[in-house]
Amino acid sequence: MISTLVFCSSVLAEDWPQYHGTNSNRTTQEKIANTDWKQKKPKQLWGAKTPTGFSSMILANGAAYTTISEEIDGIPSEVCVSFDAETGETRWKANLDIWRVDHGGGNAGAPNNKGGDGPRTTPSYSDDRIYAYTSDML
């Protein structure tokens, strides 16, 4: 499964450095001028292929971060990836661990998917560092 995620311009958006936002309350002080998206759809600034998983994006210091599953040397792996928030270009990738599904994987939360969900955690940003866990919380 491949999904496409879209981010707003970091010039207009404040940082969203962790899951549920800065204060973990799922809110922002920003105002959206156009709320009638049926009449005037927002312009997609960029998209990125993010194979499998449940990870959300975070936004910090002009970059967007998430975790994905990706084969590295033929081995399914969990990878933290950084995108330029303005252009969507990949800045870097960091291999976190082998993507393990031998303990049930996502089957615990989604019936019949055979553990094929990929990463389940969202990175966090603090003090110029990115913190990312694997789906095993390692």
Give the location of each predicted region.
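Noncatalytic, solvent-exposed loop/strand surfaces
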Residues: L12-L138
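Sec-dependent signal peptide recognition
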Residues: M1-T4
